Amino acid sequence: MMISILLVFAVSTAYCRDYGREMRATRMSVVDFWKNETKGDGLNVRVAHGVNSWPDLVDQLHEPFLNKSMMIEGDVFMQAHRRPRHRAVPVMKADTKLADRITFKEWLREVATMNKAIKINFRSNEVVRPVLQDLYASQADPTSPVLQYPVILHANVFRSPRSVETEVDPSTFVEKAKDLFPDATLSLGWTKQSNFSHLHPKFKKLSWRQLFHILEYISRLDQPVMLSVRLSVAAHSKEQLLWLLGMDQSISLLLWSDAEDHVTNWTPIVELRRSTTKNRILYDLDPKHRKFLQTDSNEPIATPPTFSLQDWQAVEFSSSGSQLSTVVRSEKGPAFLGEPTALLLSKIPPPNFPSEQKISGKVHFLPKKGMENVDLDENSGVSIYLMDKVQDIDSPKIKNSLEVFIGFDGKIKITNGQLKNLPYYETKSVGQLPDSDCYGFEVTDMGWRVKLDAWTAECGNQKLRKRRTVSIELDTPFQKNRHLRNVVVSKKGDSAVDFLLEELQHKNAYNYRNPWITVVSTILLMIYLL
C-alpha cells in the first residue's frame, strides 16, 4: 500500500514538473512579441512602472488603447508579520499608506490575464526563492492563468559607487532562476545610487574587468539574459556593450535614464543603436532622452566583425578551481578567462606549400583586480600553436608542437617543440617589446619558416606614445605531405591574467612573392624530402 502511494506521488510530481516546463513563458524578446506595435524597434516599447497596488492594476485595465503599455513592472519584497508564527510572504512594494498590500500571488494572477510582458523586480535576497517558487507553482497549477507573454526577472546584483541599497546575491539569483524558471529572461543591473551626476567620470563606465565579472554569471546560461545599463554609463561603454551583444548566445540590453543623466556626447549611443539589430536593445528613458533618439537617424550601419564565430571552434577541458575558466566567444573577439583550460581551433584548413598562412590579431591583457602588483608567472600570455594533427589533443597543455607566444610583459618567442634528432634547427627565437596592455601581432607560416611581427598597440582611449615593433623568425621542420600546420590558440600561465583578443583572423594567402623566391623554396623542400 505504501509503495502504491509513493508511486502515485512520484508520477503526479513528475507530471506537474513536466506540465510546468511545457507551459512556461516564451523566450521571445519583448520587441519581437510586440513586433507590429514596436515596428521591431526597442525604442517604441512602453513600460508601466511601479504597478504594485490594486488601483495601479485597475488603471492598467482602463488605459487608452493608443497609449497602451506593453510591459508591466512590479517590485517585490518580503513582509514579515508581527506574530512569529506567521511566516513572511512576498508582497508588492506599494505606498505604505495603503492598509492592505497586494501579495505577489495575487498580483501575478491579475497581470497574467492582461496580455502584457511582465517584469518582476527582486528587491532583496530573501524574496528570490519564494517568488520563484510561486512562479513555478503557478505554471504547474492547471487552474492558474498560463504565462504566455515574455517574463523578465530583474535584480540589482552589482554594487554601484554611493549605493543606497543592498545588492541581491548574483549567484543565488541566477542559480535559483535557472532551476525554477529557466524560460524567463534574466535581467541583471546595478544598485541605485545617490547624487549620480556628481560621480567621478571613471565610475560612469563599464570597464573590461567589470565585464569579465559579469561573464562569471551569464557565460554558461542557456536562457536569455538582459543587462540593465544606465544611459550615461552606456555612453562611455560602447565597445564593451557591443562585445556583449556579439556573444554567441541570447544577450540583450535595457538602457534606462532619469533626470540625473546628462549626456553630452550622443555619438556612442547613436552608434550603439545603429550597430545592432533593433530588437536587441530596449529603452526605458526620460522623455527628453527618448525625444532625442526619436528624431535622430536609426538607419543600420555595417560593423564588420573582428572575429568570425564560424571559423573557430571552442574546446574546453574541466578545471579543478572554482573560478570561471573558459573562452567566451563574441563577434568582437574571444575572451580567455581563469585557468588555461580552453582552446580555439581554427576551422580553416591549412594550405599546401608554397602557399602561406597568416594569423593576425590584437591582444588586450587584463590582470584581475588587485593582482597588478603581484609577482605573476612570466609565462602568462597568449599562445598560438601550429600543429600537424589536432586530433591528438587530449589536454589543454599542448606538447610536441611549434608555439608562438606573446606574453603580458612584452616577451615574445617562437619555440620549436617538434625537434627529434634534427640538430640543424634552432630550438627557439626570442624578443622583447616595451611594456603595454595591448599588443598587435601577425604570424606568418611559410611551412619551412615561421615569422612573428609584434608591436605595441593602443588600448581603448589610451593614446600610444610611439609604436614599437619587434620581428623574430625561426626555421622549422617541414611536413612531408606538403600541408602547412593547423592553428590552435590558447591561454598560458597564470589564472590571474585574463585577456581579450580584440581581433583574431586566420587567412590563407597564396604566395605572391618574387617567382625566384618560390623556385628556391621549392628546391629546398625537394632536397629536404630526399
From Swiss-Prot:
Entry annotated with the keyword rRNA-binding: no
* UniProt name for this protein: Menorin
Q: Which GO terms describe its biological process?
A: dendrite morphogenesis; dendrite self-avoidance; positive regulation of dendrite morphogenesis; regulation of dendrite extension; regulation of dendrite morphogenesis
Q: Which UniProt keywords apply?
A: Cell membrane, Membrane, Neurogenesis, Secreted, Signal
Q: Where is the signal peptide?
A: 1-16
Q: What function is annotated for this protein?
A: Required for stereotypic branching pattern of PVD somatosensory neurons. Induces and maintains tertiary branches in dendrites. Acts through the neuronal transmembrane receptor dma-1 with cell adhesion molecule sax-7 and lect-2.
One Pfam family per UniProt: Menorin_C
The membrane spanning regions, by residue number, are none
- Record note on what altering G370R does: In dz180; PVD defects
Q: Does the keyword Membrane apply?
A: yes
**Gene name as annotated:** mnr-1
Record-stated family: Belongs to the menorin family.
Q: Where in the cell is it found?
A: Cell membrane; Secreted
- Disulfide-bond pairs as recorded: none
Upon changing G42S, the result is: In dz180; PVD defects
Q: How does it sit in the membrane?
A: Peripheral membrane protein
